Structure formats: C-alpha cells, structure tokens
A protein has these predicted regions:
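PDZ-domain C-terminal substructure recognizer with occasional recognition of PDZ-binding tails
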Residues: 150, 156-157, 171-212
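Alpha-helical transmembrane signal-anchor/signal-peptide segments
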Residues: 33-38, 127-145, 150
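Conserved PDZ fold ligand-binding element
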Residues: 144-166, 242, 335
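Membrane-embedded helix-turn/re-entrant segments that form the catalytic/gating core
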Residues: 31-115, 220, 226-229, 234
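Functional transmembrane alpha-helices
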Residues: 2, 87-95, 202-300, 312-338, ...
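Residue-level signature of transmembrane alpha-helical entry/exit and packing/kink sites
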Residues: 3, 7-11, 95-104, 111, ...
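Active-site His/Glu-centered metal-binding helix of metallohydrolases
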Residues: 24-29, 109, 113, 304, ...
Length: 360
C-alpha cells in the first residue's frame, strides 16, 4: 500500500499532467484551425472509461505511458472511404502544411510552456535559496591563502562588481586564469580589498569532459539565505531556469550521440517513479520543479526527428512543403516502423538500466 501511495500514485499523477498538457496542445491548435478531433486519450490501448462530448470522445486508456489525439483524416490509408465535402473541410490532411506543422509542434511546445509556468509557480511559492558568499575553508598554498584571505571573510565585490551569491564568485573567477582580480571582502566590521591571481586548473564538467578553469582555492561555508521573490522576480527566475534546463537537455542529447554521456546513465519510468516517490515523501513542493524538468525532457524528446514522434512527423511535413506533395503511405509506414523499432529499443535500454540500478 505504501509503495502505491508514495511511488506509483505520484508518478501517475505527474505523468498524467504532463501527457494531458502535451495532448491539449495538439487538441487546441487543431480546433483553432478547424480540424475535427475524433478522440482525446490519456493513455494507450484499450479504453478504461470514456465520454462523448460534442464531436470528440474523451478517453482514459489502460496503458498510462502516453496519450494521443485522433484527428479526422489523420493516418488514413489509401483504401479508406472518401470523406464528404463537409467532412473533408474539417480533416487534418485538408489543412495547409504549415498549419499541420503547427498542430504537430503544439504538443511539445505546450510541455515547454508548462515547464515555464511550473517553474514560475515554484519560485512564487518558495522563493530561492542562495549560497552566502562566505569563505568556509581555504586551500593550503593556494592563491587565496597567499593573497591573505581568511575563513569567515564575506566576498562583497569582485573588480567593483557587487557579489550577492556564491555562484557569482565562480562565474567571475573561472575565466580569469592568470589575471589579477581585486576582491573586496567584509571581515568583522571592516572592508578590505585583496588582489589575487587565479591559477589554471583542469577539472571535469557534468558530462565528465576535461575543462580548464580558474581557481583561487576557497570553499563556501555552505550557509544559505532564503530570498522571497516578487511575481516579476519569480517570472524572471522561472524563464531563465526553463531556458537553462532546455539548453542542458539539448546538450545532453548531443553528448549521447557523441558517446560522451554513457547510455547506461539514461533512466526510464522506474527511475522517474522512484524519484517522484522520494520527492513526494520529502516535500510535495519539490515535485513542482521536478515536474517542470520532466516536462522539458518530454517536449525535447518528442521534437527529435524520429518517425512516430512529433519531430518525425514534422520532418514528413517539411518534406511535403519542399517537394509539393506528401510522402506515400508506404514510405511513411516504413519510416514509422523504423521509428517504432528505435523507440522500443530505447525503452528496453532505459528499463534495463532502471532494473540494474534497483538490483545494485
């Protein structure tokens, strides 16, 4: 019972919200362009419950790992019965290619918009925690020790630029190897200006690659300060966090193809369920930014140019836009079979990784 309440239920709720907004994007833009939507389903497979409202049947299906919007004329084979003129006007295929691209792209972009809204909401509620720019430890024989820094010094400016958080120190120092920096510190009730020359060091980035960076040999005290944000401040913080996660997600995909990031690091539904459950037990509020990160990952994944994903369909439509006619049904089916194989293979790999982690 505890496993269901703490792991399975939060996972289903979070995934359900993400899938709903993804499919809502397709649905709303399709309706805006006058396309008849036959089905709106959360989940795949057999129908659990459903209700017809207007021209659309709304469903909850048995497999909760996805969803779909079925539009009139979408995916029809060449032997399908022709539509009446009235129905043809409402079909997906009758719309201009750019409108169809907008309908397909709306799902992933709604996931990105959801992430932006979710991050903004989180910062409105929780504010931010910043690391106080206070020195907790100084490395022996380091530039900082030679320059006269002491434990407990609070860095308030570097080269005349005000410092309000520990992260700003790293930003100022890492690209300044060999360049003298004037750093103003608060020591007791006095202000002192010390000159330090960062030394070049080779470290690892988050992908395990060697990177050169400037270091002065100081460690943060670890003291945190809670800062409440105004609505405008929360919106600004939410925007930059969304953009930061989008960039990191895209870079991670590139590094995967470059084999810099090992494929064994990929996680799937089991890992997401574990993380969702752990966060739900620790603090339900933490589920908000976690959901935003997963929403961005879902959006970027669906934009990959793989047949069967939204990105693959966008590629088909771009080809149609260039050559003036759609690919044949047979060509699309072959491409989609390849895409399905790739997707099933990926799912098998991430589930294998998840199970391996559990056994370890």
């Amino acid at each position: 019972m505890n496993i269901f309440l703490y792991y399975i239920l939060p996972f289903i709720v979070v995934l359900g919200i993400l899938i709903f907004f993804h499919e809502l994007g397709h649905f709303l833009v399709a309706k805006y362009f006058g396309v008849k939507v036959l089905k709106f389903s959360l989940g795949f497979g057999s129908k659990l419950v459903g209700r017809q409202i207007g021209e659309t049947e709304y469903l909850i299906s048995v497999i909760p790992l996805g969803g779909y919007v079925k539009m009139l004329g979408e995916g029809e084979n060449e032997d399908a019965e022709p539509l009446s003129p009235e129905e043809e006007e409402k079909s997906f295929t009758s719309k201009h290619t750019l409108k169809r691209i907008a309908i397909v792209a709306a799902g992933p972009f709604f996931n990105l918009f959801l992430a932006l809204f979710t991050f903004c909401l989180f910062y409105m509620i929780a504010g931010i925690q910043i690391g106080v720019p206070e020195i907790g430890q100084i490395t022996a024989n380091s530039p900082a020790q030679e320059a006269g820094f002491l434990e407990g010094d609070v860095i308030i400016a570097i080269e005349g630029k005000s410092i309000g958080a520990w992260s700003e120190i790293k930003d100022a120092v890492q690209y300044s190897s060999g360049i003298p920096l004037e750093i103003t510190v608060k020591r007791g009730g006095s202000l002192l200006t010390l000159t330090v020359i960062p030394e070049e060091s080779v470290g690892k980035n988050i992908f395990g690659e060697d990177v050169k960076t400037g270091l002065i040999g100081i460690v943060a005290s670890g003291r945190l300060q809670a800062v409440a944000l105004s609505p405008l401040g929360a919106a600004k913080e939410g925007f930059w966090k969304t953009w930061e996660v989008i960039k990191l997600t895209c870079l991670t995909v590139i590094k995967l193809f470059q084999r810099v990031v090992p494929i064994k690091t990929l996680g799937g539904p089991i890992l997401i369920s574990q993380m969702t459950g752990q966060l739900a037990q620790e603090n339900l509020l933490y589920l908000i930014p976690f959901m935003a990160v997963i929403s961005i990952n879902l959006g970027i994944l669906n934009l990959l140019p793989v047949p069967i994903l939204d990105g693959g369909l966008i590629i088909f439509l771009l080809i149609e836009l260039v050559i003036g006619k759609p690919l044949s049904i047979k060509q699309q089916e072959i491409a989609q079979k390849i895409g399905l194989f790739l997707l099933v293979t990926l799912m098998a790999v991430v589930i294998f990784n998840d199970v391996t982690r559990l056994l370890e």
